[in-house]
From Swiss-Prot:
Lipid-binding residues (covalent, S-diacylglycerol cysteine): C17
Lipidation (N-palmitoyl cysteine): C17
Keywords in alphabetical order: Cell membrane, Lipoprotein, Membrane, Palmitate, Signal
Keyword DNA repair: no
Membrane topology: Lipid-anchor
Signal sequence, start to end: 1-16
Identification of the protein by name: Membrane-bound protein LytA
Compartment list: Cell membrane
Induction: Repressed by LytR.
Record's function text: Possible role in the secretion of LytB and LytC.
Cellular component, GO annotation: plasma membrane
């Protein structure tokens, strides 16, 4: 009987050491895989939540977040900038960072 209880205890102990590999809600599958950095020319605000930057002679619209909105006041149309953005699952370009190009 003692061996049976010891065996049962050992099995329970090992089952508690298992690893749960389920993805938690909101966790990215591949972080930073869709983030790009490019240089371009700042055009300006397209609307209250979008800026336009010309990259490789093509206009690019980027959705801005509350964090990136505060930085936009220091840029004028025609400024050379370096943008870091992420392309989400819907194909939208989300601005992560904008800086003056050197």
């Amino acid at each position: 009987m003692k061996k049976f209880i010891a065996l049962l205890f050992f099995i329970l102990l090992l089952s508690g050491c298992g690893v749960n590999s389920q993805k938690s809600q909101g966790e990215d599958v591949s972080p930073d895989s869709n983030i790009e950095t490019k240089e371009g020319t700042y055009v300006g605000l397209a609307d209250t939540h979008t800026i336009e930057v010309t990259v490789d002679n093509e206009p690019v619209s980027l959705d801005i977040t509350e964090e990136s909105t505060s930085d936009l006041d220091k840029f004028n149309s025609g400024d050379k900038v370096t943008i870091t953005y992420e392309k989400n699952d819907e194909g939208q370009l989300l601005l992560k960072d904008i800086e003056r190009a050197n």
